[in-house]
Amino acid sequence: MEAHQFIKAPGITTAIEQAALAAANSALANAVVVRPFLSHQQIEILINLMQPRQLVFRPEVFWNHPIQRVIHNELELYCRARSGRCLEIGAHPRSINDNPNVVHRCFLRPVGRDVQRWYTAPTRGPAANCRRSALRGLPAADRTYCLDGFSGCNFPAETGIALYSLHDMSPSDVAEAMFRHGMTRLYAALHLPPEVLLPPGTYRTASYLLIHDGRRVVVTYEGDTSAGYNHDVSNLRSWIRTTKVTGDHPLVIERVRAIGCHFVLLLTAAPEPSPMPYVPYPRSTEVYVRSIFGPGGTPSLFPTSCSTKSTFHAVPAHIWDRLMLFGATLDDQAFCCSRLMTYLRGISYKVTVGTLVANEGWNASEDALTAVITAAYLTICHQRYLRTQAISKGMRRLEREHAQKFITRLYSWLFEKSGRDYIPGRQLEFYAQCRRWLSAGFHLDPRVLVFDESAPCHCRTAIRKALSKFCCFMKWLGQECTCFLQPAEGAVGDQGHDNEAYEGSDVDPAESAISDISGSYVVPGTALQPLYQALDLPAEIVARAGRLTATVKVSQVDGRIDCETLLGNKTFRTSFVDGAVLETNGPERHNLSFDASQSTMAAGPFSLTYAASAAGLEVRYVAAGLDHRAVFAPGVSPRSAPGEVTAFCSALYRFNREAQRHSLIGNLWFHPEGLIGLFAPFSPGHVWESANPFCGESTLYTRTWSEVDAVSSPARPDLGFMSEPSIPSRAATPTLAAPLPPPAPDPSPPPSAPALAEPASGATAGAPAITHQTARHRRLLFTYPDGSKVFAGSLFESTCTWLVNASNVDHRPGGGLCHAFYQRYPASFDAASFVMRDGAAAYTLTPRPIIHAVAPDYRLEHNPKRLEAAYRETCSRLGTAAYPLLGTGIYQVPIGPSFDAWERNHRPGDELYLPELAARWFEANRPTRPTLTITEDVARTANLAIELDSATDVGRACAGCRVTPGVVQYQFTAGVPGSGKSRSITQADVDVVVVPTRELRNAWRRRGFAAFTPHTAARVTQGRRVVIDEAPSLPPHLLLLHMQRAATVHLLGDPNQIPAIDFEHAGLVPAIRPDLGPTSWWHVTHRWPADVCELIRGAYPMIQTTSRVLRSLFWGEPAVGQKLVFTQAAKPANPGSVTVHEAQGATYTETTIIATADARGLIQSSRAHAIVALTRHTEKCVIIDAPGLLREVGISDAIVNNFFLAGGEIGHQRPSVIPRGNPDANVDTLAAFPPSCQISAFHQLAEELGHRPVPVAAVLPPCPELEQGLLYLPQELTTCDSVVTFELTDIVHCRMAAPSQRKAVLSTLVGRYGGRTKLYNASHSDVRDSLARFIPAIGPVQVTTCELYELVEAMVEKGQDGSAVLELDLCNRDVSRITFFQKDCNKFTTGETIAHGKVGQGISAWSKTFCALFGPWFRAIEKAILALLPQGVFYGDAFDDTVFSAAVAAAKASMVFENDFSEFDSTQNNFSLGLECAIMEECGMPQWLIRLYHLIRSAWILQAPKESLRGFWKKHSGEPGTLLWNTVWNMAVITHCYDFRDFQVAAFKGDDSIVLCSEYRQSPGAAVLIAGCGLKLKVDFRPIGLYAGVVVAPGLGALPDVVRFAGRLTEKNWGPGPERAEQLRLAVSDFLRKLTNVAQMCVDVVSRVYGVSPGLVHNLIGMLQAVADGKAHFTESVKPVLDLTNSILCRVE
């Protein structure tokens, strides 16, 4: 039934209070700070004037005009923020030094009061020149100011501001002055009181006293201690009435800001001013009442500035309105003047009841009271007269109308029809009055005044107009017009070249001269010692640099500086251009910012300026707090000793490498010429020129190769250590040395080039004679089963057919091993002799077979795929090859990845040569062949099974065979079905093949192998080389028998397929089934079609297929090909069929899978049967699944059909799995925390947080009022009164709520999803542009079967199957059903745990059909977003915790900006949904799918077990893409609403977000978005923050939140079964694992962020240690449920 209208909301008061508190906090955060000391009356005036702005009073200064100055400062901030670089008119002297954005100031020569202002002006800075010129009558010292006034100056500027300096100029004068300046916009602050529109008099309002004598007006505010404003009345009236200026200098005047009668006018030059009527005083609080009897003679004994009394009196509007309402509604008999006087006296008293002002009152003079009573009485009398006359005349008119005859009525009907402009009663015209009549009124209300007047500019006089017409006439006659009256078009002043504020100037800006510093300079290292110390260089390098002197030759051309640095016997070249990339020793990138006109350079924290001087080149260095100047004399220095230079270079290289290994972010890579050079520490475009062509950049810091060394020590171990060369040197090509004799070829050389036809006979004719080397120093480390070997030693000792060189991309000579190859085989680098290329690798046969392989440069980018390809490209050959570890030298590829890549990509018989460092690594990580240990129990059970088997006819061959305890070594090649495991076996590798079935035996025998079934093979496997195919499906006792009897055993099979079945049900098979670990996995299948691969990718995550068949699975079609059934009982009903177990290992072109009802238990208990059935075909498979058995294990057509319907494609994408690792116990500080008492730890936690034991187990919160939607609930709301819990402590630190109660579900439904949604209709472009800071434009996204597999895998992991995925039929309710569940966990809090007034949390689950429809798209969009995230931005959980912690630790000088949304899901509306749809459209999602998503999200029904809610908008936590779109919306709000300074790291997950920066501020467009969407942001900015269960401490890292984790344990029920206690132990153990290395740091940081003692955190860690050891103590308690929902009323209908 519908009952939402009967639900009261006692909790609404709390919600209103919270909303009011949030509004107050927001207002205070944006309040105006009032600094002067004020009286109580001044405070009231200021509060009323500044409404609705919040004021914060911090009195600290005394001001002469406090009210005006506060208003002035506020309007000044507004004007300066919008004007930018501008011209200022009449600037106050005290503001000159504070506003550098002003390019010119116009002053008048000081007279009177202005002289006093100049005497108190600052005497330093720019104000000093202005002060000196103003007081001494001197001309302006520079062009930043003038003393000619605004109208007498012509300095060009596009924008100007005038703060209370235009009161003595009319709008027309200002328009002409703006034209002379070329100004298009002028912000003018003016004081325009409405009293200037009235006749002369003295007017007193609540804020000020105004004296008006008809010519001048003087205004003095309350509390002023000096004279007030004094302005010309006619000008003020012009500014109030004028909205535009016409003539030759047109402009429009718009009031853009007002505080009381202080206005900011925006004057904009416009060619055609349009009407702009405006109401100047809509918030006026005074009404001006006219005095009937004007004053006569002298008003007082003492003369004043005004010779007359006021003819109008300012009366509070509320007094006049109440008086008129009272008098107009009095009875005729009761109306009299005395009664009006009595009422006026009553409402003139101020009445206050407590803090409530019941009557504001009015403190009036006797003249004002007399005038008000007189005016009110006469006005009411006149109105009563009008009322009487109107009724009387109206009655007579009615009598005449109804007495008309037919002819008169017909005449009126024919000739007096009403038109469109007819208004009933308007044509009667009972009464008309004149403006000067007494009946015209006695008061003026400024609230209804409307002005729209235009003022003509003064340049168009009558004579000027006549002469202009005459000129035009002369032009018409063809005469030259010499009219001097025409205004100068485009007058922009005579000095526009040096004015940056004027953008429309036609004068080209003058370019500053660039000083030329070309020449030769001497750079001693001693001159740069302070810089070295600021760079934190080691003392050794500083000392060595101090002993060196360099000569730097500088050439400067077109903003580019080229330097040639001569340091000892080495020459370096650098090129300085703007934007040049600087080499770094970490992932951070630096670009050089170079401005030749300003002679500055900067990059990162380093900057310098240079200038030519008489003494040479003067350079100023700024780095790390250092400000150092050095002067380098011109000339040439003597050369430094080569040994000293080499030692310096080597020490510098070691320092760079050390910094590279230990730095997370990195710094500049310091080159020699970067430290001993003019522009230290920059060295862009670094090139070292060497006379030796073999000594490239890589040998700058190492020993240079020499021909003598190569000849005398051909087997030098370190020849193969360095893998890659760098950029080859620019030196000229020298004379080539004779190659050394290479090793002898293989006894059986390859007949042809690799993968090529037979080469020409002369291909190797030029090769020298090949002889064996006499000395062999290599050491064998390991031999693989395929014959491959790993050696420690030199590559050139190998006798393999091919040698592999670590080359560069251009295959040119370089350093390291490449240099050694060039010394021995220089002809091998001739590109013309390359016989083949495979990818980046090049093959050559001259002078011997060599492969030039190219590894990736890990200094630039980590590219594992390229590393794999580097080895794979060397396998297109015949014969064996000798490899180095590619990339582990100069390119800095780690040893492990390079070795693993070689293991996966080599051919049998190949050799790998390791240097000593890599050899030591290999010996520590030596691969071992797996072993199987047969225990006595296993042997005894296997022998029992053999005895039982030997008693049968099949197993007679096993009689007498026994399994003995021992260790068996084996090789197990596992792979996906159809991967070619069997085809990889050759007859030369095996003597006997053992297979489980006759079909497989026959297949092997057809290939020429001696194949046997398991039982008969017992006679022939003794001492033979045995291959066991489909090993996991062999009976385990026979498998153990053959493995133990064979000389070598090679297992083939798939661990995921059907294992051995215990047909006898004796229990022996599972008892002795061995645990075999594959030694290698093959993931490429040549059998499976693409859809099969994706459907069962959950069992084979890395599977790939070579099949070109995209879709092969079909439902509901006739049977084709081989029929497969699951049970023997189904075979008679399907003639020609075989069971899946019998078909294992077989391959068919077409198959039909028939699932019968008797196979339900088999399929549910063994998903392997379904996998085998699906993987037997190569082209087509028809599934006949009447009982729906395969659908129950996730195999159905609905998922596939919906996937292709949504635009999915078959293909491969990057998997969404993020690699994670467990931290090593390198600093095991957790071991110092012994287990502690659980009770004491929780009691100390309660004491610190202020929580106390509570007598209730749960709370039913009040149900809020349903504001939108329809609620349906059952007639009975039954609840339980108590709850039984197994708890760790009786003190709970979470918000308590009852998850299982019907009333709790009801309150959660209404509270979370029944509130009013604030809609916001606006364009998404601004928010999307802001979001582009974190998520750039995404572009089309491809949805592939990889995302479909991940979706199916996630469903299977959650225990779901495909039965809930239906065909997309929107008429079916099950397709679009959204179910709702109450969440059983609550949020940790340090505040109130019971009386929090918060409703529970819920989970809304979309239908599995919609999840399968949208899920792949959202996964693909998420991958695209992750690929585009900038450095330092972390999304959701898609990162390793150690990476995030390292990024936080690197941001040492940052603060933590932390935001927490309130009601994040509830406030999402049409705008956030529109942003989601806009991003979906940007990614290429089909339009019908976007519209369907918008429809589902905009109107929905949440279906709880017994309740339902029909609502609109909001966000549901269980819908697909919840984390994705919540995180995107969070990113959009944060980046649109806030600007961050020194941004370092940002992390977003759902509604949680942090940003590490030095400062933040709210962006200009934030208020519009926050107010439009009703967002509730709770921002905190502190040194340490909280985010997603971790404590974020800049400079230290992300640390586990011990207090929060321990607090959440107190709320859960850990019973009644032991499995809950085990879950607790595992969860605590996982959490403690994160504390392994940071436990002590957590104690210090977590205690600080929560404000608790470090001893508490220490005690909590000890308590968690005890729980992880299984020593947790649980207490069973029975507590009542606190029901606060008594206000829920239910009506039975």
UniProtKB/Swiss-Prot annotation:
Designated name of the protein: Non-structural polyprotein pORF1
Residues covered by region (NTPase/helicase): 960-1204
Lineage: Viruses, Riboviria, Orthornavirae, Kitrinoviricota, Alsuviricetes
Keyword Ribosomal protein: no
Protein family (similarity comment): Belongs to the hepevirus non-structural polyprotein family.
Record Pfam families: DUF3729, Macro, Peptidase_C41, RdRP_2, Viral_helicase1, Vmethyltransf
Methyltransferase as annotated region, ranges: 60-240
Species the sequence originates in: Hepatitis E virus genotype 1 (isolate Human/Burma) (HEV-1)
Composition bias, Low complexity: 754-768
Domain Alphavirus-like MT: 56-240
E.C. designation(s): 2.1.1.-, 2.7.7.-, 3.4.-.-, 3.6.4.-
Segments of this protein annotated with the region Y-domain: 241-439
Domain RdRp catalytic: start-end pairs: 1454-1565
